[in-house]
Protein backbone atom coordinates (compact mmCIF):
# COMPACT_ATOMS: atom_id res chain seq x y z
CA UNK A 1 0.00 0.00 0.00
CA UNK A 2 1.38 3.42 -0.99
CA UNK A 3 1.74 6.29 1.47
CA UNK A 4 -1.13 8.10 -0.26
CA UNK A 5 -3.42 5.08 0.09
CA UNK A 6 -2.38 4.59 3.72
CA UNK A 7 -3.06 8.25 4.50
CA UNK A 8 -6.48 8.07 2.84
CA UNK A 9 -7.29 4.88 4.73
CA UNK A 10 -6.49 6.50 8.09
CA UNK A 11 -8.13 9.88 7.45
CA UNK A 12 -11.61 10.56 8.79
CA UNK A 13 -14.59 11.37 6.62
CA UNK A 14 -17.79 13.20 7.52
CA UNK A 15 -19.74 9.97 7.75
CA UNK A 16 -17.20 8.70 10.31
CA UNK A 17 -17.75 11.73 12.51
CA UNK A 18 -21.53 11.41 12.22
CA UNK A 19 -21.45 7.73 13.20
CA UNK A 20 -19.11 8.44 16.12
CA UNK A 21 -21.53 11.12 17.33
CA UNK A 22 -24.49 8.74 17.03
CA UNK A 23 -22.70 5.94 18.89
CA UNK A 24 -21.52 8.39 21.54
CA UNK A 25 -25.07 9.66 22.02
CA UNK A 26 -26.63 6.21 22.29
CA UNK A 27 -24.06 4.94 24.75
CA UNK A 28 -24.17 8.10 26.85
CA UNK A 29 -27.78 7.18 27.57
CA UNK A 30 -26.83 3.54 28.12
CA UNK A 31 -23.98 4.50 30.46
CA UNK A 32 -26.23 6.68 32.58
CA UNK A 33 -28.84 3.92 32.83
CA UNK A 34 -26.22 1.30 33.70
CA UNK A 35 -24.80 3.57 36.40
CA UNK A 36 -28.18 3.50 38.11
CA UNK A 37 -28.34 -0.28 37.64
CA UNK A 38 -24.97 -0.54 39.34
CA UNK A 39 -26.24 1.45 42.29
CA UNK A 40 -29.17 -0.92 42.56
CA UNK A 41 -26.96 -4.01 42.44
CA UNK A 42 -24.65 -2.52 45.05
CA UNK A 43 -27.58 -1.80 47.36
CA UNK A 44 -28.96 -5.30 46.87
CA UNK A 45 -25.61 -6.87 47.75
CA UNK A 46 -25.06 -4.75 50.83
CA UNK A 47 -24.25 -6.99 53.78
CA UNK A 48 -23.25 -9.95 51.61
CA UNK A 49 -19.60 -8.99 51.26
CA UNK A 50 -19.93 -8.70 47.47
CA UNK A 51 -21.25 -5.15 47.15
CA UNK A 52 -17.75 -3.85 46.36
CA UNK A 53 -17.82 -5.88 43.14
CA UNK A 54 -21.26 -4.70 42.00
CA UNK A 55 -19.96 -2.26 39.40
CA UNK A 56 -17.19 -4.58 38.23
CA UNK A 57 -19.79 -7.04 36.95
CA UNK A 58 -21.18 -4.46 34.51
CA UNK A 59 -18.06 -2.33 34.06
CA UNK A 60 -17.47 -3.66 30.55
CA UNK A 61 -20.52 -1.75 29.35
CA UNK A 62 -18.60 1.52 29.81
CA UNK A 63 -16.03 0.49 27.21
CA UNK A 64 -18.54 -0.33 24.49
CA UNK A 65 -18.82 3.02 22.70
CA UNK A 66 -15.16 3.29 21.78
CA UNK A 67 -14.76 -0.39 20.95
CA UNK A 68 -17.85 -0.58 18.74
CA UNK A 69 -17.02 2.63 16.87
CA UNK A 70 -13.44 1.53 16.29
CA UNK A 71 -14.55 -1.91 15.10
CA UNK A 72 -16.93 -0.40 12.55
CA UNK A 73 -14.88 2.57 11.29
CA UNK A 74 -11.40 1.06 11.72
CA UNK A 75 -9.35 4.26 11.81
CA UNK A 76 -6.82 5.52 14.40
CA UNK A 77 -8.30 7.77 17.08
CA UNK A 78 -11.90 6.64 16.69
CA UNK A 79 -11.99 4.61 19.91
CA UNK A 80 -10.55 7.39 22.04
CA UNK A 81 -12.71 10.19 20.65
CA UNK A 82 -15.97 8.23 20.70
CA UNK A 83 -15.46 7.09 24.29
CA UNK A 84 -14.60 10.64 25.34
CA UNK A 85 -17.66 12.00 23.54
CA UNK A 86 -19.92 9.46 25.23
CA UNK A 87 -18.60 10.45 28.65
CA UNK A 88 -19.11 14.17 27.98
CA UNK A 89 -22.70 13.54 26.88
CA UNK A 90 -23.28 11.27 29.87
CA UNK A 91 -22.23 14.12 32.15
CA UNK A 92 -24.52 16.55 30.33
CA UNK A 93 -27.41 14.10 30.62
CA UNK A 94 -27.17 14.09 34.40
CA UNK A 95 -24.40 11.87 35.73
CA UNK A 96 -23.53 13.27 39.15
CA UNK A 97 -19.85 12.32 38.87
CA UNK A 98 -18.81 15.71 37.55
CA UNK A 99 -15.57 16.16 35.64
CA UNK A 100 -14.39 12.73 36.84
CA UNK A 101 -16.84 11.21 34.34
CA UNK A 102 -15.00 12.89 31.48
CA UNK A 103 -11.61 11.89 32.89
CA UNK A 104 -12.69 8.26 33.09
CA UNK A 105 -13.95 8.44 29.51
CA UNK A 106 -10.59 9.75 28.36
CA UNK A 107 -8.68 7.04 30.22
CA UNK A 108 -10.97 4.26 29.02
CA UNK A 109 -10.72 5.56 25.47
CA UNK A 110 -6.94 5.56 25.74
CA UNK A 111 -7.03 1.91 26.75
CA UNK A 112 -9.26 1.08 23.80
CA UNK A 113 -7.01 2.97 21.41
CA UNK A 114 -3.84 1.33 22.69
CA UNK A 115 -5.36 -2.11 22.27
CA UNK A 116 -6.00 -1.63 18.56
CA UNK A 117 -2.71 0.24 18.13
CA UNK A 118 -0.84 -2.82 19.41
CA UNK A 119 -2.17 -4.60 16.32
CA UNK A 120 -1.15 -1.59 14.18
CA UNK A 121 -4.82 -1.00 13.35
CA UNK A 122 -4.72 -4.00 11.01
CA UNK A 123 -6.42 -6.68 13.09
CA UNK A 124 -10.11 -6.17 13.72
CA UNK A 125 -11.33 -9.32 15.38
CA UNK A 126 -12.37 -10.71 18.75
CA UNK A 127 -8.76 -10.90 19.92
CA UNK A 128 -7.95 -7.24 19.25
CA UNK A 129 -11.29 -6.19 20.70
CA UNK A 130 -10.63 -8.25 23.83
CA UNK A 131 -7.17 -6.74 24.29
CA UNK A 132 -8.59 -3.23 23.85
CA UNK A 133 -11.44 -3.87 26.28
CA UNK A 134 -9.28 -5.44 28.97
CA UNK A 135 -6.72 -2.63 28.67
CA UNK A 136 -9.52 -0.11 29.20
CA UNK A 137 -10.42 -1.91 32.40
CA UNK A 138 -6.82 -1.99 33.60
CA UNK A 139 -6.23 1.66 32.73
CA UNK A 140 -9.26 2.89 34.63
CA UNK A 141 -8.46 0.65 37.58
CA UNK A 142 -5.07 2.30 38.01
CA UNK A 143 -6.85 5.65 38.02
CA UNK A 144 -9.26 4.38 40.67
CA UNK A 145 -6.37 3.19 42.84
CA UNK A 146 -5.93 6.84 43.74
CA UNK A 147 -9.24 8.51 42.90
CA UNK A 148 -11.26 5.94 44.86
CA UNK A 149 -8.36 5.06 47.17
CA UNK A 150 -8.35 1.43 46.07
CA UNK A 151 -4.68 1.31 47.05
CA UNK A 152 -5.94 0.72 50.59
CA UNK A 153 -7.57 -2.58 49.63
CA UNK A 154 -6.15 -6.01 50.43
CA UNK A 155 -4.18 -7.67 47.58
CA UNK A 156 -6.87 -10.28 46.88
CA UNK A 157 -9.45 -7.53 46.50
CA UNK A 158 -7.36 -6.08 43.69
CA UNK A 159 -7.26 -9.49 42.03
CA UNK A 160 -11.01 -9.85 42.40
CA UNK A 161 -11.74 -6.43 40.92
CA UNK A 162 -9.42 -6.95 37.95
CA UNK A 163 -10.58 -10.48 37.16
CA UNK A 164 -14.30 -9.66 37.32
CA UNK A 165 -13.78 -6.43 35.41
CA UNK A 166 -11.77 -8.19 32.70
CA UNK A 167 -14.48 -10.83 32.25
CA UNK A 168 -17.08 -8.09 32.03
CA UNK A 169 -14.94 -6.25 29.48
CA UNK A 170 -14.71 -9.36 27.32
CA UNK A 171 -18.43 -10.12 27.46
CA UNK A 172 -19.80 -6.62 26.90
CA UNK A 173 -17.13 -4.64 25.09
CA UNK A 174 -15.54 -7.39 23.00
CA UNK A 175 -18.04 -10.18 22.38
CA UNK A 176 -21.30 -8.22 22.35
CA UNK A 177 -19.79 -5.30 20.41
CA UNK A 178 -18.48 -7.72 17.80
CA UNK A 179 -21.90 -9.34 17.49
CA UNK A 180 -23.52 -5.92 17.13
CA UNK A 181 -21.00 -4.74 14.56
CA UNK A 182 -21.17 -7.94 12.52
CA UNK A 183 -24.95 -7.93 12.69
CA UNK A 184 -25.17 -4.35 11.42
CA UNK A 185 -22.67 -5.09 8.65
CA UNK A 186 -24.71 -8.04 7.39
CA UNK A 187 -27.80 -5.83 7.02
CA UNK A 188 -25.93 -3.61 4.57
CA UNK A 189 -26.36 -0.39 6.55
CA UNK A 190 -22.60 -0.21 7.15
CA UNK A 191 -21.58 -0.70 3.51
CA UNK A 192 -19.84 2.69 3.43
CA UNK A 193 -17.65 1.81 6.40
CA UNK A 194 -14.62 -0.46 6.65
CA UNK A 195 -16.56 -3.23 8.38
CA UNK A 196 -19.11 -3.25 5.57
CA UNK A 197 -16.40 -3.37 2.92
CA UNK A 198 -14.90 -6.43 4.59
CA UNK A 199 -18.26 -8.19 4.54
CA UNK A 200 -18.62 -7.31 0.85
CA UNK A 201 -15.19 -8.78 0.09
CA UNK A 202 -16.06 -11.95 1.99
CA UNK A 203 -19.23 -12.36 -0.08
CA UNK A 204 -17.28 -11.90 -3.32
CA UNK A 205 -14.74 -14.51 -2.26
CA UNK A 206 -17.54 -16.96 -1.41
CA UNK A 207 -19.11 -16.43 -4.84
CA UNK A 208 -15.79 -17.01 -6.57
CA UNK A 209 -15.30 -20.26 -4.66
Stretch-by-stretch model annotation:
Residues 23-31, 65-66, 86, 90, ...:
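Alpha-helical transmembrane segments of multipass membrane proteins
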Residues 4, 8-12, 16, 51, ...:
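Membrane-helix interfacial "entry" motifs
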Amino acid sequence: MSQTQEKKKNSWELRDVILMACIGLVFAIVYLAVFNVGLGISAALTGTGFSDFAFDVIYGVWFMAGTLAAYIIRRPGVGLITELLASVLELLFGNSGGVAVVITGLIQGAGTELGFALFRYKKWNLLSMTVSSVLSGIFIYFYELFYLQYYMLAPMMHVGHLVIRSISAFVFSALICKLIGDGLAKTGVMKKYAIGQNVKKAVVYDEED
